[in-house]
Amino acid sequence: MPQGNKIASPSGTRRRVFRVLLIFALILTVVFIFHGITFPPSHVDFSQSKQVLDAYDFVELETRVSSPHAPNPFTDASLKGVFSTADGSKHWQVDGFCDSDDGSVFRIRFMPPAAGDYTYSVEYQQGWSHRTSSGSFHVTDGHRRGPIRIDAQNRWHFVWEGTGEHYFFNGTTAYWLVGWRDDNVIRAAIERLHNLKINRMRVTIAGRTDKFFGEPVMAAESWTPHIRPWRTGKSLRLLHYFGRLGQKLHLSWGGLFDFISNSENPEDLYHPGFDYSRFDISYWQKFDGALACAHDRDMIISLVLDMNDSRTHPAAGSEDERRFIRYAIARFGAYSNITWDLGDDLDHYRDDAWTHDTGTLIKQWDPYKHLATSHPIDNIHQDRASDWFDFTSFQEWSRNQHAFMLAQRKQQEGLGRIIPQANEEYGYEDHYPAWAIGGAGSDSADALRRTAWEIVMAGGYQTSGETARRGTNILPDTGGGWMNGRGDNTMTMFQGYVHMVDFMTSFDWWKTEPHDELVNQGNYCLAKPGEIYAIYLPHAGKVTLQILPGSYNATWWNANTGQKSTLSTVNVASPTWTSPGAPGVNDWALLLRKK
């Protein structure tokens, strides 16, 4: 009799189904039990980048971690170290940071502040395991500039730690510098600004925007302001792809797939789907490259933690927010060329208590105590009397900056705590909002240049911004200016600022004080009476100066072109002296120094 296919019995089918379900249940049980448990790696290898380095460079210890890796290396593993002078007189507690998505690489950096021998001990922790390493290195005096500090003798001003040179703060904004895909564009932007004697750039770490403020810029592959310090959540990414698939198949289901597809989109400021517990390593590595390039040119980078333009932030005071700040400190703190800025337009997304607490924490967490500030819209929210707050970062757009900065100096003196005064947002070239006070022409290169003179002649410092009209991802696509730092040869505003920098740094400006009462006709004067008189004449002409008797060298400077004209020795016997007329029209500066 021919054999046909056997028919499975119902009981056999039930047994097989039961076995499959049992295996599936066991797998789920194992996953549930062990999910989140951090097992130790099989081995950890430590390596040291340098045995000998200059003071204010940094040594880096790389930690290679084998599998099994921490489930989330940003929360489930850590690298910490103690660095000490060989004689044990000084110690620094330093945090390391994860530098790979899978947790296979950690790094810890240390910037030694002086020549000598140093030792260290580091510990990597993952789960219940601890792996340690120790070593030493030698530091030479390479005459490098260290971090900028407040001049202890002249507290309105800054000095470079290490060399003791004075730092003439001359800044610009380039908020989304690291939004460039091509690192060569970033390096070229820094180099160009450095050649224009810009020595400070405001760059955001986490700020994002979908507003372009009327400028001819747009997000595209080559540049975007939709920067991504964090990774997006895996589950949200899967939902997003599922939603996109439904859209492509033209499925509706009451708009469900449209809703799902929008559940995660890093380009969406309102719903980026960030997992605040995981950092996007490629973005932070790109930022490292920008900082290293700036470091080689003594360019200070003001690290603006976040911006009001971002529509989502980690919750104020949350573990996510503090993890972000501590990661930034661990990663970037060893660069000598940084300062901290708690946030742009800060008072619109954080209150004063947060500002005070967070500024204080940053000074506790940062082993190098880099200078720190904040940048609110309303200047009453600056924490000017607190120890953590090192200099002002005003936002004031009027075209009466000289009087404003003098008033701020007076207010600061009234607090019993002298710190440098800086206006870091008084306007951008070719960009002047309707709400700002100034009138037609207030956004021209010449108006901003003159405004910068008003600020520095009040003993203050300033940060300006170049035109963005040359376009980013919009033809001619050669600019970006204040938004991203890129520029071309048609952008010449900062050439005018160069002459101001040259004039101010030609004398010991930090030894002078505003003394407008010594000059007439609306002119401005910085003086150390009897030694230095630096005068700015907004409308050229002559100036009458109340001056102590003596012989002085005198030089006219064309504030617009940098042209210099030396006068014969000025011999003063009476308490007033009237200059000859300036050699030209427009604005001029006059410098008298005692022989």
Residue ranges and their predicted role:
Residues 9-26:
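N-terminal Sec-pathway targeting helices
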Residues 41-87, 94-97, 137-140, 522-526:
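Non-catalytic, glycine-rich low-complexity segments
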Residues 42-46, 52, 72, 420-421, ...:
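Aromatic- and carboxylate-lined catalytic core of secreted/periplasmic carbohydrate-active enzymes
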Residues 78, 142-403, 417:
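Active-site mouth of glycoside hydrolases
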Residues 88, 92-155, 179:
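Extended acidic/polar, glycine-enriched regions
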Residues 107-110, 574-582:
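Exposed aromatic-hydrophobic patches
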Residues 346, 389-391, 408-446:
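Active-site clefts of carbohydrate-active enzymes
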